[in-house]
Amino acid sequence: MSLPREANPRRGPAGPAPVRRSIATISLSGTLEEKLTAAAQAGFDGVEIFEGDLITCRLSPAEVRLRAADLGLEVLLYQPFRDYEAVPDELLERNLRRAERKFELMASLGAATLLVCSNVSPAAVDDAARAADQLHRLAERARGHGMRIAYEALAWGRHVSSYASAWQLVAAADHPQLGICLDSFHILSLRHDSSAIRDIPGEKIFFLQLADAPLLNMDGG
């Protein structure tokens, strides 16, 4: 679900906005068009578009936006953007070019939030300062498009696998267009204590995902 604030940097800090309930298209079966219809019939306010669903859809991004609007749905988030942060400079430039293409696609979709997953690539380095700086740079690019970045810790992330670590990077990056995405699956699968979530400023929690799955051993122990 989206915990939104205005993504327009020209208007300054936004006040509280109502929570909007959404569902990720990866959670539904069928074509993207069928998934949009199902989400609308179930009473959701919006959808999170999964990249794989868009790639296989016969509609263009702009047509997907119109179809969603016709059904009374907002495209609240586009996901996932993988293996971005904590990388060498030459790889960062490539990743920023990749991000620019995503922002252009999101503009056609009408999505204002990009979900960035913690890096799982062997190319990622264990350097929190570098990761925070690179997230700041990505958020600055997002600002230029009137968009924002929701950073999510994957339970299998190479160096960032907890919401606490993700929040430390977001706080260090200190950019208004950068916030955190909290996912119950990734938090509970590693049995992390969720009590520290109350210490994260509400305006920096950009997205909340509630997901269920069989209990598995995610730490290899």
Where do the model's predicted regions map?
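Active-site beta-loop-alpha junctions enriched in small/polar residues
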Residues: A24-L28, F50-D53, P80-D83, N119-S121, ...
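Active-site acidic/histidine proton-transfer and metal-coordination neighborhood
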Residues: R5-A17, E33, D70, E85-I180, ...
